[in-house]
């Protein structure tokens, strides 16, 4: 079963949030799962929704009013959310359609006309804010975006990660960053600058990798691309001197992460900046007059999606390495069960990670492994814990859903393994 979290300390936090809402004239406050880069997986520093609710799933939106607290998530997490919200004031709201803003419908139904809903402008994109404003306006409800209430309440908030980045050699990338930059600039169509906020796109474009986000080899940063040069906004302490020199030779200067705001003001004072409304935060958008922004399509994703010859061959190598690790796990598990041992789901996951780590170029899991034995294999996004994981016997089915990050590429595999005789129903 999903690990329960302690909710005993959440009442004072909710009280503090409600007091801050009252002081700022807010009738409700939205806490999403995103970070300023709209990442699927976010660093601990941006896990405000998890910190406030105790729910550890990757997708969900919390809403707090003066008298109620709610969490919306999809069917992947219903069982987990029910367990982790138990004993708290938060009530689970089950999304009927994943990735939709059903919390806005609820706000329209339960808040009076003239109410104000607050949120953190860093965590909402331009398109999300526009959509929310339109929906709330139907009931004469205002959306107020410049409310950073969590910042003052989260006393032990983890700092932004400071893991060192490294360069992905061309032997793995198959294309130099200067060639990639040239390809992107050819698509800028007269826009003086183009702002890139997605962490995976920056990593691909610059041929760099990081370790700022669990299971994702990315570095928290922004990239402002000009006609002939580029500015990479990142904690400079994370960039080795040798990499800084290499970047500078390629026309890329390293700037402080927080410097993105001033750089946009300077560039936007005389030039236009291309952006994507579904990617850019309201916080950055509102730094400039609307006329200085130019809506563009995603210039990186189409290029990133087409694998070059080197990448294709490297993906085969990554899958081969992953296959070796999986076969070694099968052999280990087979021997363990034959000798009468009963390893736990958690131990199997740790063992698989260990076999992957033996492969050249491995630097982490691509997502937390899902190892579910018997009925646990039917729990969506099941996560085995060391103290509660089921013991595996030489019977029934074992689900393995896992992957690895290699310099060659990323893997994601799902296997269902029969550990003994199975019924005709299972075979079908």
Indicate where each model-derived feature is located.
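Active-site neighborhoods and metal-handling regions in enzymes and metal-associated proteins
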Residues: 1-428
